[in-house]
Structure formats: C-alpha cells, structure tokens
C-alpha cells in the first residue's frame, strides 16, 4: 500500500507539474495601445498597472498597456490615418464618430457597447486662477474685462477646448435677453482675450502654470485640481462658474485593429474594467466624476455642486460641430488670429 500510495503521489505531482508547465506555455505576452486625449496620463497610468495585474492573475498573460496622448481631434485623425490603437479614450463622441465614418476602423454602433453611452467618467469645465484671485474672476462675464488674459486650447485640435467654448456659449445664450447674435459677440470678445491657442489641454495648463502666461485657465475640472495639487501647490484657486457643461469623454474598441491583432477579449475587458468600483475610485482620486451612482456621496465630498448643460441640450455633437467648429463656422468667424 505504501508503494501504491507513493506511486499515486508521484503521478499527482507529475500531473500538477505538467499543468503548470502547460499553463506557462500557453501564457502570452500581450500589448494594448490606448490612444487618449491630453490630460488623462495620470489616470490611465494608475488604472493600467492595476488592470494588467488583474489580467495576469486571471489568464496568466503578461499585459503591457501603452498610452498615447494629445489633442482629441489630432488623436482621432492619427487613428484614422493608421495608428493601430486597440482602444480609444477620447474627449468627444464626435471624434470617435469621425473614425467610424471616415476610416470605418470603429463600428458605427460603438456607443452601445458599454454603459452610459460608453462614457465611464464625466468632468466639467472650471476656471483656474492665480492665488487670491487678483483679477476678481467669478463668472464668464469677468473673462472679457479689459485687463484679463484667458488661456484655452485650440478647438480645432483639442476636445477640451470645444467643451470650454460650448460652456462659454451656453452661458452667453442663458443671459437675460441672450440671443445667437449676443452669444456670438461674447465669444468674439472672449477669444480676443486669448494670447495663445495651444493644441491640447495639457499644453494650455503648462502655458498657464509654468510659463506664467494669463490670468485664468479654462480647464477640465480634473486638470484644474491636478494643477492646484501637484503642478503649483499653493499657487492657484479654482473658481466654479454659474453655468458649465457636462463633459462626457467616451471610450471605444477599435474593431479593425483588435480583430487583426487578436486583442478583442482583453480590450473589451480593459474598457469594462473602467466601470468597476475599483477603477471608479481611481477616477475620483484623479479628479474625474464617477458614473457609478453608489459612489455619488463619496464623490460629492470632493466635487462642488454645479449647474451644467449637456451636449444634447446643444443639439448633439453633429449639429454643434457643424454650427461651431466646421470650416467657416462660428469659431472661424469670431477668432482673429494673433
């Protein structure tokens, strides 16, 4: 019996060793490329490491997630022109729609693939001013005072810049007696106070924070908090305007790329992970507003209440883009190049 037991034990050990060997042999080295908009570097650096660890524990596969950042419109054009992103996490739905329509590398129904129209987090637009708010900036109307310089990126290349512009437009239209013409005049006045248009939100932040240009930065809320906390601690204040915009930066799988590379399963798991409580808490930590309603109270301790309009209130992205940002549209009409 002892000999038989020893034999069974040897067979069992061999079986376990073989299973481990097969598991190791089957494990793969995978890479994903996340092409994102400008100020998401810190958010995805933290999320990527945690997701890669979870994926390896689940599958045995070693996963490396690479990031590419820039103005949302520029990033969309890069993917259109052949950059092999497995996923895109951009500032505007219209940028993803552009890829779906032009190169067709993303399926047209991308918005239906993940919750909340494929938007895992939201943000808004606030003002970042220098400590003590020396120019007394409280609302959009203060941005056109004679001695105020405003820093904002170029809406031709930056998704954040389009949110900035639309928030300003919505405020102007909402004023007593506000009309299309008065809103257009306000935008013309506002952009006459902009000394430089950077190509992306992070570039504008560095212009304001490091180059010390301007009195107020129109910024993603997360970028304003980051600047206040890390880029210039004690040097800036955040001002919440009376009306802003609900910024909804969406995500999508780049279907033609993942099917070519065989990464659809891991790409889908990666974007689904963004909706988990773990990733949603990382979003809060990085100053994004979560979409998970169970975290609303937790998020409310950090984020001030704010009245917002949505892109739907402004007619949707197709209409807004055609009206404001297409060649010859309102932005081209009101912006006088320096």
Question: What residues fall within each predicted segment?
Answer:
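A bilobed periplasmic-binding-protein/Venus flytrap-type ligand-binding module shared by bacterial periplasmic
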Residues: 124-133, 248-265, 282-286
């Amino acid at each position: 019996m002892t000999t038989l037991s020893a034999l069974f034990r040897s067979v069992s050990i061999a079986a376990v060793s073989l299973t481990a060997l097969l598991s190791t042999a089957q494990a793969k080295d995978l890479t994903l490329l996340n092409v994102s908009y400008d100020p998401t570097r810190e958010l995805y650096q933290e999320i990527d490491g945690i997701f890669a660890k979870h994926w390896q524990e689940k599958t045995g596969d070693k996963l490396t997630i690479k990031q590419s950042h820039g103005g949302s419109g520029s990033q969309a054009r890069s993917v259109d022109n052949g950059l092999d992103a497995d996923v895109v996490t951009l500032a505007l739905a219209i940028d993803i729609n552009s890829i779906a329509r032009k190169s067709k590398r993303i399926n047209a129904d991308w918005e239906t693939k993940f919750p909340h129209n494929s938007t895992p987090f939201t943000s808004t637009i606030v003002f970042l001013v220098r400590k003590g708010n020396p120019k007394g900036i409280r609302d959009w109307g203060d941005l056109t005072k004679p001695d105020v310089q405003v820093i904002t990126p170029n809406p031709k290349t930056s998704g954040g810049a389009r949110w900035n512009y639309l928030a300003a437009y919505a405020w102007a239209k909402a004023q007593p007696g506000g009309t299309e013409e008065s809103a257009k005049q306000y935008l013309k006045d506002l952009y006459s106070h902009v000394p430089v248009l950077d190509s992306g939100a992070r570039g504008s932040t560095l212009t304001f924070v490091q180059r010390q240009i301007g009195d107020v930065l129109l910024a993603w809320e997360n970028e304003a908090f980051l600047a206040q906390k890390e880029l210039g601690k004690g040097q800036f204040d955040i001002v919440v305007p009376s009306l802003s915009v609900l910024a909804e930066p969406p995500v999508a799988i780049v279907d033609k790329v993942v099917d070519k590379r065989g990464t659809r399963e891991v790409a889908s798991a990666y974007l689904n992970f963004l909706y988990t409580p773990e990733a949603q808490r990382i979003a809060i930590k990085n100053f994004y507003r979560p979409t998970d309603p169970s975290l609303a109270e937790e998020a409310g301790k950090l984020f001030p209440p704010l009245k917002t309009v949505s892109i739907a209130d402004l007619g949707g992205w197709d209409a807004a883009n055609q009206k404001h940002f297409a060649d010859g549209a309102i932005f081209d009409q009101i912006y006088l190049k320096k």
